[in-house]
């Protein structure tokens, strides 16, 4: 990946906002950050996260990245009145390039999403008019997990969707194995990226729809390695197929309401410094990260999606982020997929098993 000067990041952000949104925004170059103020915040950051660096060169590099991120957070806050960005989170000493390399997969998505098409059919029943849904409250969402230094967001997104569909259809909630996909799925590329529908396709082709429990095949790729597949474990859930949902937020909301959580891809470039609130103006160029929609609230101002991430519970709102509904924030509607699960409580849905 080509190196960019992190000191230009905030200015580039400003220019891109103006180009994309025209006169609706007033360009603001973030003010310089005083070294004394930055040093005080940096000291608190290191203490909070137990950070220690070897040598003056590395220390200086981390401080400069942190200082630049203070400017970036300032700018993002000026553009998002309902959200808060700051440098208290664990990623604040990374340059944007380092963050992207460690936690995002832009190259994989660019190579493999060209032929992604939505399925025509989703649900024949009329919308119910439900204004808010949170599948966490319905017992269909497992605790927030952590992918670590492995580019396995796709596996966490796919498995989170299957966990949610399994529980929403009437089965008991069970934490399922991301490691099964990271190590064994030979359609995707482990820590180097993957796609959620490809993962579901592999489950159908190679496992007859069966997914192991996390307890029987725990996650071990947090350090960035891909252990060999041992392809054995206790089956915790079974899918009957998968669907690529319409690229339409209302249709996605219908699926979330009636069926359960949905796996989606987003541009998470600016999530590095997200702390809380509803993101209403997300910088987005291309998809690079897989996450899980677990609910929405149309009554809120602004209305928002509830999105589960896989960077641990110390990130964002205890591992979650809220994105404003209706304006394709972070390109959330561009790649929605869901597994299907057989249940006596839901009608038959056409599936893709390829």
Swiss-Prot record:
Enzyme class: hydrolase
Gene Ontology BP terms: proteolysis
Active-site residues per Swiss-Prot or TrEMBL entry: 153, 289, 309
Reported function: The cysteine proteinases have a potential role in host-parasite interaction and virulence.
Cysteines joined through disulfide linkages: 150-191, 184-229, 282-330
GO molecular function: cysteine-type peptidase activity
Domain of life of the source: Eukaryota
Protein name per its UniProtKB record: Cysteine proteinase 1
InterPro entries for the chain: Papain-like_cys_pep_sf, Pept_asp_AS, Pept_cys_AS, Pept_his_AS, Peptidase_C1A, Peptidase_C1A_C, Peptidase_C1A_papain-like, Prot_inhib_I29
Residues making up the propeptide: 25-125
UniProt keyword annotations, A-Z: Disulfide bond, Glycoprotein, Hydrolase, Protease, Signal, Thiol protease, Virulence, Zymogen
Top-level taxonomy: Eukaryota, Discoba, Euglenozoa, Kinetoplastea, Metakinetoplastina
Signal peptide range in chain numbering: 1-24
Assigned protein family: Belongs to the peptidase C1 family.
Enzyme Commission designation: 3.4.22.-
Positions bearing carbohydrate: 208
